[in-house]
Amino acid sequence: MDDFLSISLLSVAMLVGCYVAGIIPLAVNFSEERLKLVTVLGAGLLCGTALAVIVPEGVHALYEEVLEGKHHQTSEMKQNGIASDKAAEISSVHEHEHSHDHTQLHAYIGVSLVLGFVFMLLVDQIGSSHVHSSDDPETARPSSSKITTTLGLVVHAAADGVALGAAASTSQTSVQLIVFVAIMLHKAPAAFGLVSFLMHAGLERNRIRKHLLVFALAAPAMSMLTYLGLSKSSKEALSEVNATGVAMLFSAGTFLYVATVHVLPEVGGMGHSHKPDTTGGRGLSRLEVAALVLGCLIPLILSIGHQH
């Protein structure tokens, strides 16, 4: 029951923290120039988060079990005092097994990232084709862009929730806290980036709040579902296929699609601008480039500070 209480508290903290971080751009009134600057910073945060936090976290989750298993086997051999020639023979067998595991895991990394990216690409195309058929082509693209951006981040947040739920089922408080900190490090900037992008895209404030609420609810809801839905046998099965790492890398692919295909072109003036006579076509000013770079670096600095 203690595990259930801790996962409940972490889920509530995640929901509140994410929503508060996302509401900041809405709570402050920005001029058009300030809003562009905040949007650029948010875009940088999304890109930096995808590259510096989510991909490394996913890779770490994949390799953690293999590395721990290797360490455990060597310590066991030392404790049991196995003869040196026998130990060498066993270790060579294990080395072969581990090299096989590593090649398998390399494949998981690429496949998960690409599938996440392609999934969002297909969702984007299906969404935009539906909108194109019913609406004016001028307004079709940006509206599908908003939906894709939110959907991509929600898919990512749901994968985060699975990771936290799986961590809670290990009954180790330290593991839960590490996963929670890792998730909050990128959920808060992502919420800020999502809201600033939706504001820049000209969405109404009430609808932005709804988008933010869906994004904020995704991870806590999935963490609770994962924790409650995992039986002992399914926990073992999940750990065998490294489901947490695969889920995080899949979501990293969706995150990268959202950050690079939607948010960056929009901010750089290549996408739709709701004010055609603005400076959108000229690209970014020096200050905006500095804000973009700063946004990319913030998650990197935070992730360096956060150690496993």
Curated annotation (Swiss-Prot):
Where does the source fall among the domains of life? Eukaryota
Q: Does the keyword Ubl conjugation apply?
A: no
The task this protein performs is described as: Transports zinc ions across cell and organelle membranes into the cytoplasm and regulates intracellular zinc homeostasis. Participates in the zinc ions efflux out of the secretory compartments. Regulates intracellular zinc level, resulting in the enhancement of AKT1 and MAPK3/MAPK1 (Erk1/2) phosphorylation in response to the BCR activation. Also functions as a membrane androgen receptor that mediates, through a G protein, the non-classical androgen signaling pathway, characterized by the activation of MAPK3/MAPK1 (Erk1/2) and transcription factors CREB1 or ATF1.
Family affiliation: Belongs to the ZIP transporter (TC 2.A.5) family.
Organism, scientific name: Mus musculus (Mouse)
GO BP annotations of the record are: bicellular tight junction assembly; intracellular zinc ion homeostasis; regulation of cellular response to testosterone stimulus; regulation of vascular endothelial cell proliferation; zinc ion transmembrane transport
Protein name, entry field: Zinc transporter ZIP9
User: Which residues, renumbered to this chain, are glycosylated?
Assistant: 29, 242
A Pfam family annotated for this chain is Zip
- GO annotations of cellular component type: mitochondrial membrane; mitochondrion; nucleus; perinuclear region of cytoplasm; plasma membrane; trans-Golgi network
Q: Which cysteines are joined by disulfide bonds?
A: none
* Keyword annotations from UniProtKB, A to Z: Cell membrane, Cytoplasm, Glycoprotein, Golgi apparatus, Ion transport, Membrane, Mitochondrion, Nucleus, Transmembrane, Transmembrane helix, Transport, Zinc, Zinc transport
Major subcellular location class: Golgi
Protein's cellular compartments: Golgi apparatus, trans-Golgi network membrane; Cell membrane; Cytoplasm, Perinuclear region; Mitochondrion
Which is one GO molecular function term here? androgen binding
